[in-house]
Amino acid sequence: MRMVSIASGSSGNCIYIGSDSTHLLVDAGISNKRIQQGLNEIGLTGNDVNGILITHEHSDHIKGLGVLSRKYEIPIYGTRETLDEIAAAGSLGKFDKGLLTPVCPDLDFMVGDLTVKPFKIDHDAANPVAYRVQNGEKSVAVATDMGHFDQYIICLLYTSPSPRDTERSRMPSSA
């Protein structure tokens, strides 16, 4: 599994997560041109993307969503409230609302060979989520714009330590 930050920050967010056969974007908050450049740098194009996971509806997370969706007809995943806000926004232009796929926090779903778990986060948006993506034993999580995090989120982000990490935790620390 591979994760690449195409863009991150207040000017726009777009993260690539993928396996050998399934390719996802988390957010599309930069121009379609910049997304294409980022994908090209890792040997992909928009045609390779199997889904876009939207964390919330703020412009720095959806700026390129309309163009990307229209051009490549990529399914868009997000909470019902987030998708309703996106569909109501005139700034995205016309796009196929049939590509909008609602997800529920804490209910896993599959995109290709990747298991995706959305989970609630604290942010001033319409039911925002972060995502944990798993492929076999490997997983990665993307949690943006969090006001704070609690024990529940820590548990979701935690993965079983490797045997090496477990062995290290048994060793006395050097002073």
Predicted feature locations:
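Conserved beta-strand hairpin/beta-sheet module of binuclear metal-dependent hydrolase folds
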Residues: 1-42, 128-145
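Metallo-beta-lactamase
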Residues: 80-130, 134-137
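Hydrophobic packing residues within well-ordered alpha-helices of enzyme cores
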Residues: 35, 65-68, 86, 153, ...
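Active-site metal-binding motif and surrounding structural segment of the metallo-beta-lactamase
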Residues: 32-78
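Hydrophobic alpha-helical segments, chiefly the membrane-spanning helices
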Residues: 169-175
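Short amphipathic alpha-helices and their capping/turn segments at secondary-structure boundaries
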Residues: 148-157
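Active-site metal-binding loops of divalent metal-dependent hydrolases
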Residues: 28-30, 57, 81, 121-124, ...
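Conserved small/polar residues in nucleotide/adenosyl-binding loops
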Residues: 158-163
